[in-house]
């Protein structure tokens, strides 16, 4: 499978033409272009991951205590408006903000790997690990950090993932949501 980057407007148009859950971008484009579409029935997921809503479903699980070393004031430094404006699209802004978070707390950044959907892996230490979890993950490296993130989520999901990461690092939820809105 090949990967291409498309702008936000084109992405939204393609996504709006989805007819069934799990339909790939290739299937949608084939249908729109009048090309043959394989009618292989894909397995439907049992649940769709929504990080911002998953906290509402309590599940007993071990949650390690994480020491946070980033002062609340430092989170305001996370957003360099000039550099953020130079990023290309939502994916670029998402990656830039994650890399900025890494710069604030390099030693504890590995805790970001704990952020996962119910059946979805969002962060990993390698591209291959994300592709193994989902062939359509479209993994991107977070700067030169050695950490990778899946980018095939819509902008709202990217915002929810970023906000969850910020809160995990000790950021106030209101500040985290404000920063995430910049994606």
UniProtKB/Swiss-Prot annotation:
Name of protein: Negative modulator of initiation of replication
Biological processes, Gene Ontology terms: negative regulation of DNA-templated DNA replication initiation; regulation of DNA-templated transcription
Localization of this protein: Cytoplasm
Family (UniProt): Belongs to the SeqA family.
Species in which this protein is naturally found: Shewanella oneidensis (strain ATCC 700550 / JCM 31522 / CIP 106686 / LMG 19005 / NCIMB 14063 / MR-1)
A Pfam family that the UniProt record links to this protein: SeqA_N
Coiled coil feature spans: none
Subunit structure: Homodimer. Polymerizes to form helical filaments.
Predominant location category: cytoplasm
Keywords on record: Cytoplasm, DNA replication inhibitor, DNA-binding
């Amino acid at each position: 499978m090949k990967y291409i980057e498309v702008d936000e407007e084109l992405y939204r148009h393609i996504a709006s033409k989805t007819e069934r859950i799990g339909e790939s971008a290739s299937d949608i484009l084939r249908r729109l272009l009048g090309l043959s579409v394989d009618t292989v029935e894909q397995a439907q997921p049992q649940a769709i991951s929504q990080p911002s809503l998953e906290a509402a479903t309590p599940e007993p699980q071990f949650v390690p205590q994480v020491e946070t070393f980033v002062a609340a004031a430092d989170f305001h430094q996370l957003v360099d408006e000039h550099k953020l404006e130079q990023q290309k699209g939502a994916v670029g802004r998402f990656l830039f903000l994650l890399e900025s978070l890494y710069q604030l707390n390099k030693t504890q950044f590995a805790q970001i790997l704990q952020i996962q959907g119910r059946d979805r892996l969002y962060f990993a230490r390698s591209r291959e690990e994300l592709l193994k979890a989902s062939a359509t993950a479209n993994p991107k490296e977070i700067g030169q950090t050695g950490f990778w993130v899946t980018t095939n989520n819509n902008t709202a999901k990217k915002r929810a993932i970023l906000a969850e990461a910020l809160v995990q690092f000790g950021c106030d939820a209101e500040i985290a949501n404000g920063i995430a809105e910049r994606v």
